[in-house]
Each structure stands twice: as C-alpha cells, then as structure tokens.
From Swiss-Prot:
Disulfide bonds: none annotated. InterPro entries: RFI2 (IPR044274), Znf_RING (IPR001841), Znf_RING/FYVE/PHD (IPR013083). It comes from Arabidopsis thaliana. Its EC number is 2.3.2.27. GO terms for biological process: circadian rhythm; flower development; negative regulation of gene expression; protein ubiquitination; red, far-red light phototransduction; regulation of gene expression; regulation of photoperiodism, flowering; regulation of red or far-red light signaling pathway. It is found in: Nucleus. This is E3 ubiquitin-protein ligase RFI2.
C-alpha cells in the first residue's frame, strides 16, 4: 500500500520500534553525533579542537577550563548536573594535590638570622646580643667610644709611672685631669700610644737642700709658669704630661727609656751642678729670675732658682719643710736612672712649690 510505503518503514520495523515515523532514512543514520551544551558556561561542547573537554564517569561533558574552575572552588570533582563526586586523585594546575603550595616549618624561617651577634639592629653600630653574653656586647661598645679630648690619667705598663700625689705636672697646654691608678695592663686603646715614638725631652730635676734659704711656708702646691723665649718655644715639639712618682713599685716610662745615659752619668751631672751652684752663691746671682711666684700676701718671696746646667726644659722641686734630715731619700722618676734626692719624711702630705724653668 502506498501509505505504508510513503512512511518509509515497513511493518516489521515499526513493530520493533526501530523506525521513527517522522524520520526518513536507514536505521544506521540514528547514530549521528548529538550536540551537548556545557551546563557551566552554557556553550556547546564541540570536538573541533578549539577548547578542551572533559567527560566525567557519570557521562556528562563539560569544558575543561569550566570544570577545572569548579574543582578549584569546591576542592572536589563534583558534577554540576548530577552532584556525583568523582573518586580519585585530582591534580591542580600547579601539579599538586592541594590548591596552595606546601609550606614546612623550615620554609617559614628566614635565611638571615635576625638575632645574630653581627646583625646591627640598633643605631650607632650597637650589636644586639640576645644570649646575655655581655663580654661580646662590651667589645662592641668599645668601638663607639669617641676619642676623648682630655688627658687620660690611667698610667700602667711601660707608658708612664703611677703617682700618689694630688697634683699633676705637665709640659704644654692641656686640660687638668684627676690622676687615677690602674693595674690593668691593656694599653692598646691609650691615646698616647700614637706618640710613643716621638722625641721626648729629658726633664732633669734640680734638688734644693734649703741650707742657705730662709724658712717659709706655703698654703698649697702651686705650678708657676716661667717666661718662654721664642727660641725655646720654636724647639719644643708636642709635649706630653709626665708625672713624678714616690711609690716603691714604680714603672718605667718612654721618656726614661729614651734617655741614653746611665745612673753614673746622672750622678756626674748632679755633682757638676752642685759645684756650679756653689760658684753661683759665691759670685752672686748674675741672671734675674724670670719666675713669678704665687704666694699669700705678707709672705716673703721664694729664693731665685739657680741656672740649669743645660738648656733642656726642666722642673724645680721645692719641698715645703726646712732642715729636713737627709737620710730620708726617694727616687724621682725611676729608681735606677736618677740619684737620691732628700725630701721630708712626710713628703706625701706636705705641699710643695713647683716652678717650670726654660
């Protein structure tokens, strides 16, 4: 019949359900590809190579970038259509199974030790010491101490002799300082070390026996400056303060070590000076004293000092007593370099008058 023939399907196929009345052609044509849309971006999932696609185990297909964004947000591969969770180990774009990179405790510790002893955290190059090692911190503070403008009075080692008196005699201008004694032998940071190789003038000490001088008393020790003529001033280099010591355990100084004489030569100079002093008293004074004494009102002026046997800068020491016993002897500067000088037995308490003579 024509109606049956027009339908394109015979009776057997229609009963079996293998023929669709609204579709013409062979039964093999029913296997043609079907367009599938992505439920995330609502675009067609095509296998044309423009975009990658992913097919889950449930059969639903999505674009690979779309299902990947959903996986990054949820942390699990769950189908947006049927809500089934895919089992298995899924990798993120960074190649890890976790959305963030793994960090261990070692990664959180910085490479640079912030509390190292050599790491400056404070101003002025002060090193931080978190372990209580105060010795290393003190060594760091030594670098911060500026060079002082005053004379240091800690004399130890071979640089100068220690002093027990309350006065300080020095050559040249300089601020006054209070002498202190120290037994420490570390003299590396002493500001005088830079002048240890300089030429030092020897300072001969002229004794006064006071056998021919009238007795007088002074209230305290004075340091009197004499007149400096131009020739002597031009020949004076930078002068350092030198101290006289009366202690038994005296130490050597660079000024004494630089002297090339011996105790025998000093004794010979001492005898020559005594002979010249006797001639000076016999012939009378020939040179007016340039010294200006500072005494109390009403006291007689001190006697003029005798001239020095040489032209070197020197100090005259006038003990405050009169007719002292000559058995009490001390050494000035060094025990082996200078002769014995008579001083009063209580020389540690009686003040003296100091004159500087050029």
């Amino acid at each position: 019949m024509a109606g049956a023939k027009d339908s394109g399907c015979d009776d057997d196929l229609r009963i079996a359900g293998g023929c669709d009345p609204g579709k013409r052609g062979n039964p093999e044509d029913s296997s043609s590809p079907v367009e599938v849309s992505c439920s995330i971006c609502l675009e067609s999932v095509l296998d044309d190579g423009t975009r990658s696609k992913a097919k889950l185990q449930c059969g639903h297909q999505f674009h690979l970038d779309c299902i990947g964004s959903a996986f990054n947000m949820k942390g699990a591969m769950q189908c947006p259509n049927c809500r089934n969770v895919e089992k298995g180990q899924w990798l993120y774009a960074n190649g890890s199974t976790r959305p963030f990179p793994e960090f261990s405790m070692e990664d959180w510790i910085p490479e640079e030790d912030l509390y190292g002893l050599s790491y400056p955290e404070m101003q002025y190059r002060v090193h931080w010491c978190p372990f209580g090692e105060l010795s290393q911190a003190a060594a760091s503070f030594e670098e911060l101490e500026p060079a002082t403008t005053t004379y240091h009075t800690e004399f130890h080692g071979h640089h100068a002799a220690a002093v027990n008196h309350s006065y300080l005699a020095y050559v040249g201008p300089g601020p006054a300082a209070t002498p202190r004694t120290s037994d420490n032998n570390s003299t590396d940071d002493h500001p005088w070390n830079s002048h240890s190789n300089d030429h030092f003038h020897q300072l001969p000490v002229a004794p006064q026996y006071h056998h021919h001088s009238p007795s007088f008393s002074l209230p305290a020790a004075h340091v009197v400056d004499g007149e400096v003529d131009s020739s002597a001033a031009r020949g004076l280099p930078y002068a350092h303060p030198f101290l006289f010591s009366h202690r038994s355990n005296q130490r050597s100084s660079p000024a004494i070590n630089s002297y090339q004489g011996s105790s025998t030569q000093m004794r010979e100079q001492h005898h020559a000076y005594n002979h010249q002093r006797q001639q000076h008293h016999a012939n009378g004074p020939t040179l007016a004293s340039p010294l200006i004494s500072m005494t109390r009102r009403g006291l007689p002026p001190p006697p003029p000092p005798p001239p020095m046997p040489d032209q070197n800068v020197g100090f005259f020491i006038y003990p405050g007593g009169h007719h002292e016993p000559e058995t009490d002897q001390i050494h000035a500067w060094e025990r082996d370099w200078f002769p014995h000088f008579p001083v009063p037995s209580n020389h540690r308490t009686i003040p003296s008058l100091w004159h500087r003579h050029f």
